[in-house]
Structures are given as C-alpha cells and as structure tokens.
Amino acid sequence: MRVGVYTLQKVLYQGEAEAVNCQTATGEITILNHHRPLISILKKGVMKITDREKKEHYIPVSAGFLEVRSGDEAKFLVEEEAS
C-alpha cells in the first residue's frame, strides 16, 4: 500500500509499505493492504512501518490523524514527539 506520514513542516515517510502499526483512540491497530476505509485519531506512541523489503521504520508520535482510503492508501498527519 502507499503510505505517507506528514507533519505540518515535513514529510517523515512516503513510500510503499506492507504494514503500519499505530496507537489510535480505541487502541493499537495494524493496517495492511486492502484495509477497510477508516479515519481515526492517533494517540501518543511509536508508529512502526514495515516496508516492502521488510525494513522497519519507527516514528515517535505525540498526536495526529490517520485516513485509510480504498485503493490501498494510508495517510497520517502527525505531531512528532518532542526530543
């Protein structure tokens, strides 16, 4: 699926992925190809993106929103965890 993770200032990840794990307002979810359409609030946690080469990318998130669209596309607007 196509995945984009954005802040208001920059692109944190953009590319193909096999899975995305994240914390939502209702608990932890894993988004895979052919996931049903969904809009949700993201809670504080670490987002894990597994790309097509099985490499894992970790993005600390303090808050945000996600949208999963039909057609295998997931977009995330996030606020990065302060370091």
Residue ranges and their predicted role:
Residues 2-83:
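Compact, glycine-rich, soluble single-domain proteins
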